[in-house]
Amino acid sequence: MIIDCHTHLSFPGYEIRSEDHFVAAEPLDACFVLASPDQPSRQSNQLVSEYVARHPKKMLGFAIVNPVIDDISVRYWSGIKDTGFVGAVLYCGSEGFHPTHSKALQFYEVADRLHLPLFFHTVPPFGPDSVLEYIRPFLLDEIAQKFKNIKIIIGSMGLPFVNEAIYMVARHENVFGDLTVHPQKVWEVYNTVLAAHEAGVLGKLFFGSGLPVQKPQSCIETLLGFNKLLADTNLPTVPREKIREIIERPTLEILGITH
């Protein structure tokens, strides 16, 4: 199975019609649809919920939460889970809250109780109220230690703090990396994959496209093909079968998501 762990229906600066999102996801067996911070959380979650309900066999929703201002009660999040959401996505940097804020820690207790995996989204665009420091993967260390049963995904390998993300993935059994691929940034992809391979954590990375920013098919082709670009160089390569394993990883099983 091919699971895309990183897609959106909308994102600041990008939009895609739901029917176009579904067409772009054709090469995939399933994909995560992350609610976006470009509108209030309830509206964004409603948009994703309606889309997921139309395609329950393929689309899996991650509800956005800003624990500082949103409802983080068990009752509310039990209801969220009942509407087709399988996890939560947090935009600590762009929404300006520390990942270990006291309200955030309260939310993690709820997520732990409801068995919700957490996706920490890291990439720009960042607005004037964003705090770049809050996307640093090292800040998740306390969370991963305290809530060992929560599966944590570091979005986009923690860019621009990739090395921190790799250390976190290596350090914690319950922490994983989202390898969102940029076909126009092959060198960036190469360095990230090679660093993860050399650190022995390639087996804990999940494939992501970042749709609508990139199309899944282009991302798959980029991953499978970048070794060819290095054929006439002396640069180290990563075994093709290891790269294919990223694309075909049983992400749902690893995260404990029933689908």
Task: Give the location of each predicted region.
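Mid-to-C-terminal alpha-helical segments outside catalytic/metal-binding sites
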Residues: M1-H8, I16-A30, A199-K204, S218-H259
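Divalent metal-dependent hydrolysis catalytic cores, especially in the metallo-beta-lactamase
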Residues: I3-T7, P12, E19-S41, K58-N66, ...
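Conserved, mostly hydrophobic/aromatic
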Residues: H6, V48, V52, I80, ...
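A cross-domain feature marking catalytic cores of carbohydrate-active enzymes
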Residues: T7-L9, L34-S36, A63-P67, V89-C92, ...
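Acidic-and-aromatic substrate-binding clefts and catalytic sites of carbohydrate-active enzymes
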Residues: L9-I16, S36-Q43, V65-I72, E95-S102, ...
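Alpha-helical scaffolding within the catalytic cores
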Residues: I16-H21, R42-E50, D71-R75, P137-L139, ...
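Active-site gating/metal-coordination segments in enzymes
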Residues: Q43-V131, V175
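Catalytic pocket-lining loop regions of alpha/beta-barrel enzymes
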Residues: V86-G87, T100-F207
